[in-house]
Structure formats: C-alpha cells, structure tokens
Amino acid sequence: MKVLRRTFVVLSVLLVSTLAVAETTDEPVIGIVGRTDCGSFWRYDFNYETVDADGETPIVLSAAIFMSQRVHEKDIKAKGCGLLNHYTITDDKQRPTNVTSFFSLEGVFSNSNYIMIESDGFGFGIDAKRNQKYLQGRATARVNIDAFLAGRKLLNDEGYEFENVVLNLGYSQGGNSGMWVNRLVAEGYRSDELPKIDYCIIGGGPYDMYSHYRKLAEDNVSQYPVALPLILSGMIDAGGYKVKNEDVFTDDFVQYLSELFDSKEHDTDYINNFIYEKYGNADDKSLPLETIVKPEFFDEESEPMKDIVYHLKENSLVYDSWKPEKTDKISFYHSPYDEVVPFLNQESMEKHLVANGYTSFDIDSLSTDGHTDSGTLYAMYTALLLSEFVPTGMEDVF
C-alpha cells in the first residue's frame, strides 16, 4: 500500500510538472507544422527563424511551401525552387499559409513543377498581432530570403530533389519585395547559401515610392484607397513612430484605422469599399485624398512628411547606386494603365538599371488593364515564361 501511495505521489508530481511546462512554454515549433492537399497542389506550412525589421532581434515567422502533385509524390524531380514574394494583403485569411485555390499565384506557379516558397511575412500568420511593416523593403526581403533558405533545407530533409535553379517572383507589393531580394543577393546576404538568382519575373511593383507619393499629392485622388494608409503606416513604423497617425490622417479617419488594418479581419476589397462609401465616390471608385489626410500630407516639407519622405526614398530602389549583378535576368510586367501603382515606377526602375550598367532585363507593357486585372495577366505571363525558361548550362536537363 505504501508503495502504491508513493507511486501515486510521484506520478502526480510528474503530471503537475508537465502541465506547468505546457502552460509556460509558448515557444513556436520550428519546422513543418502542417501539410495540406489542395487538390492540384500541396501546401506545407512551416515556421522559421529570422530577424525583425531592425536586423538584429530574433523572431519566428510562418511560411509555406507549394508543390505540384507529381513533385509531392516524388514522381519527378522539381525544376528548381522559386522565392515568391506575396502581394498586398490586409486580412490574415489572405496569408500564404491559408492558400488552397489553384486560381492563385501559388497554385499556378507550383504547377510549373518549380517548388514555391513564400513567407507570410511580418504581421500575418504566426505574427498576426503585429504591424505588417508594409513596403519596408530591406526588412521584407531579408525575411523572405530566410524563409526561402529554411524551406529548401526542409525539402532536403524530406527527401525532395530539385535542380539548383532559383527563381524570384512577385506582383504589386511582391514586385517591390522581389527587387529588394535582388538587391540583398547582390550585396551578398547569405551568399554561401544563395549566391545568385537565375531568373526574376516581377510585375506592378512600387519601385519609386517617393515619385508615387508626389503624384498622389498632386492629383489629390486615389482609385485604390487601401494603399495610402498602408504605405504611410509602414513608413511611420520604419521611422520608429516619431510621426503619429494623427499627424497625417484626419481625426475622423484615424478612428477607423485600428479596426480596418490592425484587426487583420478585413480584406482589401472590404477596406476599399468602406473608404469609398464613407469618404469618396463608390460609383466611379475614386477618393479625394483630402477627405482622409491633413493638409500636411500635401507638403513634403511639413514636419511629419519630412520623416515619411525620407523613408519613402529609403525603401524605394532608385535613389542610390546599386545593380542586381547576381541576378542573371529580370522580366518586368507593368501596365501603362495601372491606376494603383503608376507606370512611372517602372520607368524610374528602367532608368536606374540602365544608369547603373545593368541591361539583362526586358519589360512587357502591353497590358491595357488596370492593376488587379494585370495581376491575373502577370500570372499567365509568368507561367508561360517559366515553361520556356532554360537556365544557362542546363540545356540537357530542361
């Protein structure tokens, strides 16, 4: 009886200790945390270690790996791996680790038999309670590269085979991030694991955010109102909150920012429509900016805008000397009729590349559609280019 009582006491202590550890341990699991059969492709979710926007503080973010059914079953060797930079999202349900539809960039690109690796990024997935640090170029590219390399290692651990070919893809916000990935690779970030990029296909990217701001201020109108609060909040965050939302947004609009953007419960269509209906014209999809921003916004020399303008230039890609010398080729896709990310962004990027001695690029500007519909065309354009792409020296493989 004494032995049974002693055994019960020991087991009770062990159980209490185990529960205490479970209650106090909130460290996220590193590695694969989910596998989903999406029909035409598979999605593997994983958590990985990276650093915060300051470049120093260790954090954990979530990401996804996408592969075709044949690659997943190991019937074929993948052609290579693509780093996919996600486009603008505001609802956590839009994150890469929640994608299941073939009618998505992830679904289309993974069925090219390249494996795609895409980070949820700041502010989504496992990091959903924080600011998404919108268009903070260097910081976003860094976590995207870290996700790509962590994902490739997991694929190796899982026994998947793929050619040593690296793609860099993205549209809209992903175009900006993709160009920043080219820049970090050129600077040698993790060069022992990622010495170069074989092919970059990006589209609709805000490469020159300062000129974009100037156009918005001069026109005093937006046809995609969700973008401006995201851009300004991203630059305010980049500046360490020396500027406050109240310094640039009207008092009436400020009251809605937290619910619209911080909650991560509303997608871009919902937010656009909310702003149109309350402050603009829902019929012709236009918004007079003066209805949501203060006069200081229109004066780049005003105190709040001085700091914001500094960070707009800092996170653009055309205001200091550099070239994507470790990216073999870049194909751009941008519509001259883009009402969200004006074509001036593409023109500035082209001038910058030529001025810095990089000519291994081409530009497709044949689309006559706006930003969103051109995004669909970008997906088809990229799929076609990938089907025809033969990396240098791999003619016998492809």
Task: Show which residues each predicted segment covers.
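Catalytic-loop region of hydrolases
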Residues: 22-77
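Short, surface-exposed "cap/lid" segments of acyl-processing enzymes
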Residues: 60, 70-108
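Alpha/beta-hydrolase active-site loop
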Residues: 134-156
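Primarily recognizes the serine-hydrolase "nucleophile elbow" in alpha/beta-hydrolase
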Residues: 149-223
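Accessory cap/linker subdomain of secreted extracellular hydrolases
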Residues: 203-322
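Short beta-strand/loop motif that positions the catalytic acidic residue
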Residues: 331-338
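Histidine-bearing beta->alpha loop at or near hydrolase active sites
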Residues: 337, 358, 362-385
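Conserved alpha/beta-hydrolase "acid-adjacent" motif
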Residues: 339-345
